Swiss-Prot record:
The keyword Transit peptide does not apply. GO terms for biological process: translation. This is Small ribosomal subunit protein eS24. Belongs to the eukaryotic ribosomal protein eS24 family. Keywords: Ribonucleoprotein, Ribosomal protein. It comes from the Archaea. The lineage of its organism: Archaea, Methanobacteriati, Methanobacteriota, Stenosarchaea group, Methanomicrobia. One of its GO terms (cellular component) is ribosome. It comes from Methanothrix thermoacetophila (strain DSM 6194 / JCM 14653 / NBRC 101360 / PT). Signal peptide: none annotated. One of its GO terms (molecular function) is structural constituent of ribosome.
Length: 99
């Protein structure tokens, strides 16, 4: 999976960066939100918990997707601004199996 940033804009009022990116997934399936969040966080030197993938659309007949992401300065600000269902989609916790 490769990520190409199409546009990036700073939003000082909401204390976030708004990014449109192209996700090139080659022969494999469409990548998960989690993998896109982790990769974008690594590229932009941010924590994965501060990155929100708002939407991700696969293009028909092409092996790429267009994603809209936001990187917040703090988790508190993210929870104030984003809708609860979007935050829930982007919070990835490790589930422990009961043994």
């Amino acid at each position: 999976m490769d990520i190409e940033i199409v546009s990036e804009r700073e939003n000082p009022l909401l204390k976030r960066r708004e990014i449109v990116l192209k996700v090139i997934h080659g022969e494999g399936p469409t990548p998960t939100r989690k993998s896109v969040v982790e990769r974008l966080a690594a590229i932009k030197d941010s924590k994965p918990g501060l990155v929100v993938v708002r939407k991700m659309n696969s293009l028909f007949g092409r092996r790429e997707s267009i994603a809209h992401a936001r990187i917040y300065e703090s988790e508190e600000r993210m929870r104030q601004v984003e809708n609860p269902h979007i935050v829930k989609r982007n919070v990835f916790t490790e589930q422990k199996e009961a043994s």
